[in-house]
């Protein structure tokens, strides 16, 4: 019997290797999910090690109860942008040896129709990573201006037919409320004039709406800064992204933190002074899944791992 994709953590070994685990160290899994990365980290920690996990999804918090008997482990129900508050309360801020961030929507979220993330499974049009907070996708689409819908789909979904799709959504909601994933997928399918044979026409639009509903890019920007502040000197940051918008943010952040002091060309200043302002250094190049992993887990196909170390 083969393992289903929903149980597979993407770039598991590579991301853990990037953390350079110290058996007695303190680690943070900023996106617990179903605990694949957490369990791998725990397997390398001594009884003196410690792992703090975060997740904003109540179902992930429920799944973490399976680790409740492990004294090295604790989980907190919050966004990863709030990690500094959690670590400060534990007196661990600035003392963390490694942080792992696995961005985007998780496989269990995609696989549960009632969560409303997937156009492949009919369910209520929700898309919230924390279904107890904020407005659902259905609620937003019911009242959003056509130009705002178009902008979200174009900017966050990188969908070139954003205006046509937004127009189709507004016309459709005048006939009946858009409350299910299947309804929205059909509206998008009808609006897209040219189909990509390798991708469902609703893929980009669903991504864009989901990113907007969950403020995902703002969360990443804040989370990356919080991670840098939370690490100790020599601590590692291991980040897995799943589409170009996420990876662009991670790549830019690491590059900016690795630059050092920016001074006008020709200004007489020592290289040591420039280097002293560097906050991080990149560890190796971006890592993508092996062909073997892709054969086992198609959802890994767009993933990218980047690792950096705090100086």
From Swiss-Prot:
* UniProt record, GO biological process: rRNA base methylation
Q: Which UniProt keyword terms apply here?
A: Cytoplasm, Methyltransferase, rRNA processing, S-adenosyl-L-methionine, Transferase
Q: Which GO terms describe its cellular component?
A: cytoplasm
Chief localization: cytoplasm
Residues annotated as binding S-adenosyl-L-methionine? 35-37, 55, 80, 102, 109
Question: What Enzyme Commission number(s) appear in the record?
Answer: 2.1.1.199
Which GO molecular function annotation, any one, does this entry have? rRNA (cytosine-N4-)-methyltransferase activity
Q: Which InterPro entries match?
A: RsmH, SAM-dep_MeTrfase_MraW_recog, SAM-dependent_MTases_sf
Can you state which reaction this protein catalyses?
Answer: cytidine(1402) in 16S rRNA + S-adenosyl-L-methionine = N(4)-methylcytidine(1402) in 16S rRNA + S-adenosyl-L-homocysteine + H(+)
Q: Name one Pfam family in it.
A: Methyltransf_5
Subcellular compartments: Cytoplasm
What PANTHER family does UniProt report for this protein, alphabetically?
A: 12S RRNA N4-METHYLCYTIDINE METHYLTRANSFERASE, S-ADENOSYL-METHYLTRANSFERASE MRAW
Its function, per the record, reads: Specifically methylates the N4 position of cytidine in position 1402 (C1402) of 16S rRNA.
Family per UniProt?
Belongs to the methyltransferase superfamily. RsmH family.
From the Swiss-Prot or TrEMBL record, give the protein name: Ribosomal RNA small subunit methyltransferase H
Protein source organism: Pseudoalteromonas atlantica (strain T6c / ATCC BAA-1087)
UniProt lists the gene as: rsmH
